[in-house]
């Protein structure tokens, strides 16, 4: 049984320019107080072919965690251009993935992935993208309404565990009432291919 369940994730500035920070507001419920802090990370998937290019944009610790509904704001900078695998327009424009992860006692218990579309707003640039990326004219749109949620078993503070399959929450477990249903029923549009994100875990990635 998960002691912590995400109720809602908002991206306060969406869509935005590519180089703008990501400003999230995360609401979660703890069914019991926690001894340690929760650790959160935001990861930008730079390449579908290698986790080498994943960028951890920022991380934070949140605590102490009382029982009940909790919320916090989490801001992270945009990905660094020089750490991207390529700055060719064909590689920058289009769809990639960002991932929010949450861990307790250094063990990840949930990750939420989102598609991110990178594009030019200017019609002329859309039709004829310049050979050199114009970063100041790039925009992004996170498909915040279409999350992909993966949960992992965690021992928490010696809490009793339900039976699980492959380390994930049992399918019969229902989300807390009043939460965002998209966080518990989170389809991604096909087709997809598999890409490995930070930490060696899989995340869905759209095909080119």
Curated annotation (Swiss-Prot):
Gene Ontology biological-process entries: cellular response to stress; DNA replication-dependent chromatin assembly; nucleosome disassembly; positive regulation of transcription elongation by RNA polymerase II; protein modification process; silent mating-type cassette heterochromatin formation; subtelomeric heterochromatin formation
Highest taxon of source: Eukaryota
Annotated compartments: Nucleus
Keyword annotations: Chaperone, Chromatin regulator, Nucleus, Transcription, Transcription regulation
A Pfam family it matches: ASF1_hist_chap
Region annotated Disordered, chain positions: 162-208
UniProt keyword Chaperone, yes or no: yes
GO cellular component: chromatin; chromosome, telomeric region; cytosol; H3 histone acetyltransferase complex; nucleus
UniProt keyword annotation of Transcription present: yes
Family membership noted in the UniProt record: Belongs to the ASF1 family.
Functional description taken from the UniProt entry: Histone chaperone that facilitates histone deposition and histone exchange and removal during nucleosome assembly and disassembly.
Oligomer and partners: Interacts with histone H3 and histone H4.
Protein's UniProt name: Histone chaperone ASF1
Native species: Cryptococcus neoformans var. neoformans serotype D (strain JEC21 / ATCC MYA-565) (Filobasidiella neoformans)
């Amino acid at each position: 049984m998960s002691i912590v369940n995400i109720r809602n994730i908002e991206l306060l500035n969406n869509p935005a320019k590519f180089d703008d920070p990501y400003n999230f507001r995360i609401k979660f419920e703890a069914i019991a107080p926690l001894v340690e802090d929760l650790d959160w990370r935001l990861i930008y998937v730079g390449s579908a072919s290698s986790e080498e290019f994943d960028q951890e944009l920022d991380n934070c610790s949140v605590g102490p965690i009382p029982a009940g509904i909790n919320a916090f704001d989490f801001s992270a900078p945009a990905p660094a251009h020089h750490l991207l695998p390529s700055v060719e327009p064909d590689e920058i424009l289009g769809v990639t993935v960002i991932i929010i992860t949450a861990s307790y006692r250094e063990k990840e218990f949930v990750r939420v992935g989102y598609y991110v579309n990178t594009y030019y707003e200017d019609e002329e640039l859309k039709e004829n993208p310049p050979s050199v990326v114009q970063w100041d004219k790039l925009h992004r749109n996170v498909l915040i309404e279409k999350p992909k949620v993966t949960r992992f078993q965690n021992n928490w503070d010696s809490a009793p565990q339900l039976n699980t399959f492959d380390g994930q929450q049992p399918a019969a477990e229902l989300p807390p009432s009043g939460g965002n249903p998209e966080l518990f029923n989170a389809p991604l549009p096909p087709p997809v291919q598999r890409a490995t994100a930070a930490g060696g875990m899989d995340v869905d990635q759209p095909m080119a």
